[in-house]
């Protein structure tokens, strides 16, 4: 079984998907982290961001695997480093690159196929999982929250990692990101017509997970 969770940036997809997978005994596939990993490697290798092909070469060469909810690049656990503000700022160079998108989608499908072949169901999250990557998924969820709620969560998330970011600037970035994600030609943010729409404002993570478990089990 494949469960897709799509939604805008800062909606809590990663946290919810991880906990939903744990609650159901499924494997978790963090597709967003895969694009972040490409950007992370680009920063580490001082790539010229004005040359898209340079980043494509990195994406082609890097070995990505997902294990127990963690993301590894060339056997290095990068699950935490890829969440930094610096990586967040550069991730769009990977996510908006058609060639990199094609590489990552292919790898996501391969990972899902391998896990399903072993009898393991997965929870996968991103921007277009239920539309472009896994259009035939058995259960699709669109998870969202207001921009203000998402900005507050993002500021708190960075604070917990010892990083300080401005709320107003974060809110502006989220609004810009939403518009950009919906308008981009490659992998645009789009709610699957057959997805269950869930707004999480005012809800705890536990409440959201409980609601999604109920949706999956119905």
Please describe what each predicted stretch is.
Residues 79-82, 86-160:
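ATP-dependent NMP and nucleoside kinases share a basic, alpha-helical "lid"
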Residues 16:
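Hydrophobic positions on the alpha1 helix immediately C-terminal to the Walker A/P-loop
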Residues 22-85:
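N-terminal phosphate/diphosphate-binding loop that engages ATP/GTP or pyrophosphate donors
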């Amino acid at each position: 079984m494949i469960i897709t969770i799509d939604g805008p940036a800062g909606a809590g997809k990663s946290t919810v998907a991880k906990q939903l997978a744990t609650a159901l005994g499924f494997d978790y596939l963090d597709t967003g982290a895969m694009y972040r990993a490409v950007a992370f490697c680009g920063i580490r290798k001082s790539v010229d961001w004005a040359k898209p092909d340079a980043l494509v070469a990195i994406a082609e060469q890097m070995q990505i695997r997902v294990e127990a909810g963690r993301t590894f690049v060339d056997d290095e656990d990068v699950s935490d480093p890829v969440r930094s503000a610096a990586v967040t700022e550069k991730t769009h160079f990977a996510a908006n690159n058609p060639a990199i998108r094609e590489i990552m989608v292919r790898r996501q499908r391969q990972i899902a196929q391998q896990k399903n072949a072993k009898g393991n169901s997965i929870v996968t999250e991103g921007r277009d999982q239920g539309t472009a990557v896994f259009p035939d998924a058995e259960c699709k969820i669109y998870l969202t929250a207001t921009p203000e709620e998402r900005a507050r969560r993002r500021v708190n998330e960075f604070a917990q990692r010892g990083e300080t970011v401005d709320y107003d600037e974060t809110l502006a970035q989220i609004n810009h990101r939403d518009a950009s994600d919906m308008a981009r030609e490659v992998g645009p943010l789009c709610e699957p017509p057959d997805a269950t729409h869930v707004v999480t404002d005012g809800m705890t993570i536990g409440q959201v997970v409980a609601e999604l478990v109920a949706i999956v089990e119905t």
